[in-house]
Amino acid sequence: MSLLSDLINLDLSETTEKIIAEYIWIGGSGLDLRSKARTLPGPVTDPSQLPKWNYDGSSTGQAPGEDSEVIIYPQAIFKDPFRRGNNILVMCDAYTPAGEPIPTNKRHAAAKIFSHPDVVAEVPWYGIEQEYTLLQKDINWPLGWPVGGFPGPQGPYYCGAGADKAFGRDIVDSHYKACLYAGINISGINGEVMPGQWEFQVGPSVGISAGDEIWVARYILERITEVAGVVLSFDPKPIKGDWNGAGAHTNYSTKSMREDGGYEVILKAIEKLGKKHKEHIAAYGEGNERRLTGRHETADINTFLWGVANRGASIRVGRDTEKAGKGYFEDRRPSSNMDPYVVTSMIADTTILWKP
């Protein structure tokens, strides 16, 4: 293995200008991530310098076998924490050969919303809290849990330390540093309420970049768990019973909300979100009804409720925001398996563009 490690860590810059670009795209389920690599003649700093590419869509559930070619367009570049040097990760979105976005390409519609002059003027900021569960390979049971059994009840695990409370910290810290290296605006990590469950936060990120950064952070985490021999789950309720689910709480503010008098803007935005509750819930992730039960720090899926410092609400406003009279709010409804392009653009569309 030491020889393999030596070769994997070869510094290409000593012998060649060429770099490796890992093209990443979203697969047919809308949640699975795919990637493949290609050699480029030299360092690249902007997606516009990168060639488009294609893949076999019939093997990802995104095209029929008789017309299987799907074209991927490079959209965002990050440093590659695995190959390092000048090598890069490239977040792409997918199109037909005729240039139409394929159904699983949610980035295209999101980019239209984020490029609208009214949205651009408001400089929307997002901070996304991505929860996930680490599972033991082969048995799909949470890391640190006895096989076929259960650990002690929730309580000591949230932000806990110790071999009987924190399971998978090496994976979590590796991911944290890898994201910082890649240029992702990861702002923190913590152990979650259910043992084997963790969270990382990305943001504040502006507009479409929030979606790009969450997807690439997910990809990096998939790669790290692959090396560790652990399965990564974004299921919003991986274990039935008295255990917390997994969400992707989305913190949001606009320029108007961050300025003096912003609290009134926040209240108007929350009112609009309440009027479109059903539409948002429908787009906020698969299986969310198993998580949004009104228990375990959630609001009931059929009820829209907001409150200050209330973690049982659909929308939570922080005490600091209330006191300052400006700031941000947190949409607690999105599930861990949500598409960040959909959620972020929908919040902007409802709160900025929609005129009820």
UniProtKB/Swiss-Prot annotation:
Coiled coil (residue ranges): none
Superkingdom of the source species: Eukaryota
InterPro entries: Gln_synt_N, Gln_synt_N_sf, Gln_synth/guanido_kin_cat_dom, Gln_synth_cat_dom, Gln_synth_gly_rich_site, Gln_synth_N_conserv_site, Glutamine_Synthetase
The reaction(s) this protein catalyses: L-glutamate + NH4(+) + ATP = L-glutamine + ADP + phosphate + H(+)
Residue ranges constituting the GS catalytic domain according to the UniProt record: 106-356
Cross-referenced SMART domains: Gln-synt_C
Main location: cytoplasm
Residue numbers spanned by region Disordered: 38-66
GO annotation, cellular component aspect: cytoplasm
Domain spans labelled GS beta-grasp: 19-99
Keywords tagged on the record: ATP-binding, Cytoplasm, Ligase, Nitrogen fixation, Nucleotide-binding
Keyword Cytoplasm on entry: yes
PROSITE patterns for the chain: GLNA_1, GLNA_ATP, GS_BETA_GRASP, GS_CATALYTIC
EC id: 6.3.1.2
Family note: Belongs to the glutamine synthetase family.
Self-association and partners: Homooctamer.
Protein name per Swiss-Prot or TrEMBL: Glutamine synthetase cytosolic isozyme
Taxonomic source organism: Medicago sativa
Lineage start: Eukaryota, Viridiplantae, Streptophyta, Embryophyta, Tracheophyta
